[in-house]
Curated annotation (Swiss-Prot):
Localization: Cytoplasm; Mitochondrion intermembrane space
Biased composition (Low complexity): 108-118
MF annotations from Gene Ontology: 2 iron, 2 sulfur cluster binding; 4 iron, 4 sulfur cluster binding; electron transfer activity; metal ion binding
Organism of derivation: Paracoccidioides brasiliensis (strain Pb18)
Binding-site list for [2Fe-2S] cluster: 283, 294, 297, 299
Region span, Fe-S binding site B: 344-358
Stated role: Component of the cytosolic iron-sulfur (Fe-S) protein assembly (CIA) machinery required for the maturation of extramitochondrial Fe-S proteins. Part of an electron transfer chain functioning in an early step of cytosolic Fe-S biogenesis, facilitating the de novo assembly of a [4Fe-4S] cluster on the scaffold complex CFD1-NBP35. Electrons are transferred to DRE2 from NADPH via the FAD- and FMN-containing protein TAH18.
Name assigned to this protein: Fe-S cluster assembly protein DRE2
Region spans: N-terminal SAM-like domain: 8-165
Annotated region (Disordered), positions in chain: 100-134
Entry keywords, A to Z: 2Fe-2S, 4Fe-4S, Cytoplasm, Iron, Iron-sulfur, Metal-binding, Mitochondrion
Source taxon at top rank: Eukaryota
Length: 381
């Protein structure tokens, strides 16, 4: 099918994924947009989607269309569609939605597929030999959850509505009455030991017999062991001794055994650590309001807020460094000099009556003319 043609599209909501090279040719992009209803068609750039700058809504689109680049090939598209991008595209498809390309040459309902000239593997591909990038894209699409339908198109499977199915468990009726008539229940025999529990009796009798003795008389047991049980035991209840090891020694594992411990750091590779964190829309900060991070934050908002707090704290500590006074900034006050009083003349009355420049600020009230001395940092009047 020539690149200028586009297969007929059905009704529904469409998503067009355009490579960045197509944005430099607006005439081609406008021609493609003109083939679809604008009110039911969305356009996204693959490079923005790959960088995590935009996110796709879930279960919204009926058809996702991959556009070819400016060179009319899908090479640029395959290079940008990574595993994470493809998983987001699959999540945005409705159940039964289709993933198509513009020309339907690699998959889809092209003329080769419709005529039954697909590849020998029967997966709906075209008759031409696929390149490594095309085959890798098909494999990633299958791993993301897409399947090939009867027409050879990549589709999201529709599993239908899930509902709970009640399960009715069968129950044997009158098991004890049919066996003994008195409500007693016989447990399965093991190693020639038969265990019988009585409904009204307060004892459980364990009897071991041989085949010859049983044929001679059923009333003469070889060995009889009687264990007293609480009289409140309900009918038809048996007891199992879980402490019995049946002759097999039990090996206790040491507490310091770390054979089954898994290092979580080994589960993430360099590719996973370098991937861009996609922040959910509800965690994105709004203008004029600072959003608090969740307790188990995994989108990176908690680390971002902690980094901002550390930067603010560092700037505040730098601005509030210890104030160092130079010699010119110091002033010496000698209280022994006679006649040195404030301009208000109320120095002896106390701080409440002294002016701002009074040399006696901080000293208690004293009598006018009284000598003031300082001994061991204490005021002596």
């Amino acid at each position: 099918m020539p690149p200028s043609q586009t297969p007929a599209q059905g009704s529904g909501r469409f998503l067009l994924l355009s490579p960045p090279s197509l944005s430099s040719h607006p005439e081609k992009l406008n021609a493609i947009l003109g083939l679809h209803a604008r009110e039911s068609t969305d356009l996204q750039m693959l490079d923005r989607l790959a960088l995590g700058l935009v996110s796709l809504p879930e279960s919204t689109y009926d058809v996702v269309l991959l556009l070819t680049g400016a060179d009319n090939t899908l090479a640029e598209t395959y290079r940008l569609v990574s595993r994470g991008v493809l998983q987001g595209v699959v999540n945005s498809l409705k159940p039964g939605g289709k993933l198509r390309n513009r020309d339907n040459q690699i998959w889809g309902s092209g003329s080769d597929s419709a005529a039954g000239l697909g590849s020998s593997d029967g997966d709906g591909g075209g008759g031409e030999k696929m390149s490594s990038s095309e085959q890798a894209f098909r494999n990633e699409a299958i791993l993301a959850g897409l399947v090939f339908d009867d027409r050879g198109e990549l589709a999201k499977p529709d599993f239908g509505a899930q509902q709970a199915v009640p399960l009715k468990l069968g129950r044997k009726k009158n098991l004890g009455e049919s066996a003994f008539g008195n409500g007693a229940v016989e447990l399965p025999a093991s190693n020639g030991v038969r265990v019988t529990t009585g409904a009204t009796s307060s004892t459980t009798t364990t009897t071991t017999t041989t085949a010859a003795a049983a044929a001679a008389t059923a009333a003469t047991p070889t060995t009889t062991t009687t264990t007293t049980i609480n009289s409140s035991t309900p009918s038809g209840v048996g007891f199992i001794d879980f402490s019995d090891d049946f002759g097999v020694p039990m090996v206790e594992e040491t507490q310091d055994s770390d054979e089954e411990l898994i290092d979580e750091e080994e589960l993430l590779g360099e590719y996973d650590m370098g991937r861009h964190i996609v922040q959910p829309p509800e965690c994105r900060p709004k203008a004029g309001k600072r959003r608090r991070a969740c307790k188990d934050c995994t989108c990176g908002l908690s680390q971002k807020l902690e980094a901002e707090d550390r930067a603010k704290r560092a700037n505040a500590d730098k601005a509030l460094e210890t104030l160092k006074l130079r010699t010119n900034d110091l002033a010496e006050v000698d209280f022994t000099v006679q006649g040195k009083v404030g301009s208000c003349g109320n120095c002896a009355l106390g701080d409440a009556f002294r002016c701002d420049g009074c040399p006696y600020i901080g000293l208690p009230a004293f009598k006018p003319g009284e000598e003031v001395r300082l001994l061991n940092n204490d005021v002596q009047l």
